[in-house]
Swiss-Prot record:
Family membership noted in the UniProt record: Belongs to the HAK/KUP transporter (TC 2.A.72) family.
InterPro entries recorded: K+_transporter, K_trans_C, K_trans_N, Kup
Organism the protein comes from: Shigella dysenteriae serotype 1 (strain Sd197)
Subcellular location: Cell inner membrane
Catalyzed reactions per annotation: K(+)(in) + H(+)(in) = K(+)(out) + H(+)(out)
Magnesium as UniProt keyword: no
Chief place of localization: membrane
Segments crossing the lipid bilayer: 9-29, 49-69, 103-123, 137-157, 165-185, 213-233, 247-267, 276-296, 337-357, 365-385, 398-418, 421-441
Protein name, entry field: Low affinity potassium transport system protein Kup
UniProt entry keywords in alphabetical sequence: Cell inner membrane, Cell membrane, Ion transport, Membrane, Potassium, Potassium transport, Symport, Transmembrane, Transmembrane helix, Transport
Molecular function GO labels: potassium ion transmembrane transporter activity; symporter activity
Coiled coil residues, start to end: none
GO CC terms, sorted: plasma membrane
Upper taxonomic lineage: Bacteria, Pseudomonadati, Pseudomonadota, Gammaproteobacteria, Enterobacterales
Protein's membrane topology: Multi-pass membrane protein
């Protein structure tokens, strides 16, 4: 999104506040409470409060302000960000061996996101609804049911899109951040001593005083930066400058004031640790605060759900996930999509997490939070510095210093969160592992299948020359053969000739290709090559944020002089029946998983929006 128009900059910045910062903006609901809840062996003590506040503030400065908003956000692919984009950029100028390692890192990072995203809506919404304990303690048994109701409504409206409701996100989140700042400032004025915690020496003192326990406590501190990946992933929607402007002018000051306000309250009233966020507010403001908190957490959850949809589409287009139905809910914004399968799988997972893992309180979810986030941070550091060295050609010693600085923060955070493994951290890690296995299985087995199908030695040019010299029976009209690779004879063409011994007067070999870019300009959309008097090759290129559409391809072909009409064209496609060959047991398991994924994948006619009555599928049996 361009920010050149200065008049639109405030609007874009406001929109960024509403979408990008929802997750990190709702962290004050639970972060300081989890830090000082007594689980690490110390209570609400002055040194502990100052130490945690200092750690939270400097973590926001170093990780968000410096690492992500100054360095990582520079690595964009035509303005787009995200862990898979970073993976793609990092592997452009490296050896095949290094590229394979970088791809694995990127896929692990993407898988971690899937694992962590199950926790985010649950902990955010529950933390907001838990304000009921302050307003009306007798309603605490309704926290879980109300959380499920709110999330059910949220997932149900996904199919309708969020274009209309989304217009309210920005003003609501701006109001939320102003409330954060106001509540915090009010408490700080009453106890300004808390501002001493801005001194990083309090963080150092915290480690020196509490030693090993302070290291483990980093697992709670990291809750303050959850959602940091959204700053990079949503870069394509808003641009770098509006995201930075929103952070430094609104989000960072508001978060800092609120955290320090909670700290000031705890120094004055240690018993407020049961819910320091809501106890910042005067009694008359509790119900309005509960309502705005619930709205803010719903918006944060919406941003996460949209992020899952976008990541899934990118993984599908890059060939790491099987094709699935993707519905565009807005004609104006390509990022407004809905994926039914992902939506309801995520919903089921979130409800299970709330009912089984939370045990009626969001604090139990905090124990499951952090491993995947910090793991992704480590991978982002490695991938982004690889881009700096290989793509930007920065000095290798300077890049090494940057990487060491990043890892000096990321690795302790990740290691500290490993302590959560048995108390809930296994959940996002397990979900992430499942997604990693699914993505690597689909990619590797798909490659094996295509290689097996293309093992025949027939030359496309030789076959076309032979058909032109000794043509089979020709019938009027146009036929299209979908070809996955250029210069390879489509299976459907061979089987049609073998069994039907007939061709149409005009034959088009169509290849739909995904380029390493989010978008492809219409000028470069279609390349047409006439291979013989009756054969044409058409290569249509799409970016990974675009959805291929054969009707659009035909329109472009018409502009280039190759007239095609959808309802007068026959599409021949091959349908592979797969048989597993002899393999070791572990590869056989992977093969069975691939067969399951392929059986449930979206069929090509639906994937490319081809009318079913124009499609002829020819079956073929392939051993893999």
């Amino acid at each position: 999104m361009s920010t050149d128009n200065k008049q639109s900059l405030p609007a874009i910045t406001l929109a960024a506040i509403g979408v990008v910062y929802g997750d990190i903006g709702t962290s004050p609901l639970y972060t300081l409470r989890e830090c000082l809840s007594g689980q690490f062996g110390f209570g609400v003590e002055r040194d502990a409060v100052f130490g945690f506040l200092s750690l939270i503030f400097w973590l926001l400065i170093f990780v968000v302000s410096i690492k992500y908003l100054t360095f990582v956000i520079r690595a964009d692919n035509a303005g787009e960000g995200g862990i898979l984009t970073l993976m793609s950029l990092a592997g452009r100028n490296t050896s095949a061996r290094t590229t394979s390692m970088l791809v694995i890192m990127g896929l692990i990072g993407g898988s971690f996101f899937y694992g962590e995203v199950v926790i985010t809506p649950a902990i955010s919404v529950m933390s907001a609804i838990e304000g009921l304990e302050i307003v009306a303690p007798q309603l605490d048994t309704w926290i879980v049911p109300l959380s499920i109701i709110v999330l059910t409504l949220l997932f149900m409206i996904q199919k309708h899109g969020t274009a209309m409701v989304g217009k309210l996100f920005a003003p609501i989140m701006l109001t939320w951040f102003l409330i954060l700042a106001g509540l915090g400032l009010r408490s700080i004025i009453a106890n300004p001593e808390v501002l001493h915690a801005l001194n990083p020496m309090w963080a150092v003192h915290f480690f020196l005083e509490y030693k090993t326990v302070s290291f483990i406590a980093l697992g709670a501190v990291v809750l303050s930066i959850t959602g940091v990946e959204a700053l990079y992933a949503d870069m394509g929607h808003f641009g770098k400058f509006p995201i930075r402007l929103a952070w430094f002018t609104v989000v960072l000051p508001s978060l800092t004031l609120n955290y320090f306000g909670q700290g000031a309250l705890l120094l004055k009233n240690p018993e407020a640790i049961k819910n320091p966020f809501f106890l910042l507010a005067p009694d008359w403001a509790l119900i309005p605060l509960l309502i705005i908190a619930a709205l803010a957490t719903v918006i944060a959850s919406q941003a996460v759900i949209s992020g899952v949809f976008l990541l899934t589409r990118q993984a599908v287009r890059l060939g790491y996930l099987s094709p699935m139905r993707i519905i565009h809910t807005s004609e104006m914004e390509s990022g407004q999509i809905y994926i039914p399968f992902v939506n309801w799988m995520l919903y089921v997972a979130v409800v299970i997490v709330i009912v089984i893992v939370s045990f009626e309180h969001s604090s139990n979810l905090a124990a499951a939070y952090g491993i995947a986030v910090t793991g992704t941070m480590v991978l982002t550091s490695i991938l982004s510095t690889t881009v700096a060295r290989q793509n930007w050609h920065w000095n290798k010693y300077f890049v090494a210093l940057i990487l060491i600085a990043f890892l000096c923060v990321d690795i302790p955070l990740f290691t500290a969160n490993l302590d959560k493994l048995l108390s809930g951290g296994w959940l996002p890690l397990s979900l992430g592992t499942v997604m990693f296995i699914v993505m690597t299985t689909w990619k590797s087995e798909r490659f094996r299948l295509l290689r097996r199908m293309h093992e025949h030695g027939n030359s496309l040019e030789a076959m076309i020359a032979s058909l032109e010299k000794s043509p089979p029976v020709r019938v009027p009209g146009t036929e299209v053969y979908m070809s996955r690779a250029i210069n390879v004879i489509p299976f459907a063409l061979m089987h049609n000739l073998k069994h039907n011994k007939v061709l149409h007067e005009r034959v088009i070999l169509l290849t739909l290709r995904t380029e390493d870019a989010p978008y492809v300009h219409n000028v470069r959309r279609v390349q047409i090559e006439q291979l013989s008097p009756t054969f044409w090759r058409v290569v249509a290129s799409y970016g990974w944020r675009e959805t291929p559409n054969v009707e659009e391809v035909f329109h472009r072909c018409g502009l280039e002089g190759l007239s095609c009409r959808m309802m007068e064209t026959s599409f021949f496609m091959s349908h592979e029946s797969l048989i597993l060959g002899k393999r070791p047991w572990y590869l056989r398991l992977r093969g069975k998983l691939y067969l399951l994924l392929q059986r449930n994948a979206l069929r090509a006619p639906d994937q490319f929006e081809i009318p079913p009555n124009r499609v002829i599928e020819l079956g073929t049996q392939v051993e893999i």
